[in-house]
């Protein structure tokens, strides 16, 4: 009996090892096999979105004494900087929105330092929407449904205690105690409230993005968080973010993604109701959600968006983050990017919007010291940065990509990723900013 048990364990281990080896070989092989044979870009009527915009950090920079220049012109306000981006061909502004409502005196959340504590608040978002209305440029809201921040590495549940009418819908329960149906009641009401407040500033919203790098969760139903929707999520270790997309994406589909789809759909429904109540035409309003690609294979990315559709979330665009210099599944980041776009086009029937993109013009350090991968043909120089930016746009325009947002172009703490180099809080444009994005 003991021998049989040992044999079964050995067989299981051998089988598991074989499966892992096959997956690894498949990934390694796929890195060097790139072909467009049989590929057709998805058909879309959407105009290409040159989404260069002031970032969530720009207002803080000006408050802290930062200035910029371009071709001899001095720039001392967020409005003038956005005007520069419009002159360079930008077709929309951007705003990231957390559920935290007001700016507080310290960057602290739950007793810990939080650099996102005071850059994504509702109040700050409304000010950017007012600026978009003044400049007569559409704005793309990113609705995180997280208290201060979320991305592929970190998720937070939303908090609505600063919104009495929304908080009352929780009926005295903590967010982690709510069922999926109870969560969606609140999310729908929040979507409606938020959209009404934004649209009443007079701005135009043609595209709504729900979630930020939502690979592993949204609105509290997330890997590592306690939730009554799926109690097993709370005990999942962080390293599973790097294993599940590779070895077991079906686990993500069955334990996170299918629930998130219902949450996204609730927010979407609330947003569209706001258009109806305000008498604003919603015919051309579009929705997207974006995920990080560095932890995904092209096939896993396509499975994510198909899971959303299968479970009731209708989106018009698949959003992705693309950081070529970051560690990723592929040695050649451009091959990963291109194969991901083509997989989403072919398997999901969706165009792709690159919601976050940047490339370093020099060595990265500090928190981003690991983001120094050099892509072949694109050295980490100003020229290499500019060429990468241009080539991503040019390839994308013929391959089902309907827009690119250069992320945080004016943010000094982004290291060499930005499109300005800084001297004593003064931003001087790099080569990449000299390009005319309108051409």
Model-derived segments and their meaning:
Residues 2-21:
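N-terminal Sec-pathway targeting helices
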Residues 32-91:
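Boundary/entry segment of secreted carbohydrate-active catalytic domains
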Residues 50-60, 93-95, 139-143, 206-210, ...:
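Hydrophobic faces of well-ordered beta-strands that scaffold small-molecule active sites
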Residues 55-78, 98-123, 148-151, 215-218, ...:
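Acidic-and-aromatic substrate-binding clefts and catalytic sites of carbohydrate-active enzymes
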Residues 62-86, 187-197, 296-311, 386-393:
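Short, acidic/polar
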Residues 66-73, 224-247, 252, 339-343, ...:
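Aromatic-rich peripheral "rim/lid" segments of glycoside hydrolase catalytic domains that contact
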Residues 81, 142, 258, 269-287, ...:
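Glycoside hydrolase catalytic-domain groove-lining segments
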Residues 87-256, 263-279, 283-286, 362-364, ...:
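Substrate-binding cleft and catalytic face of glycoside hydrolase catalytic domains
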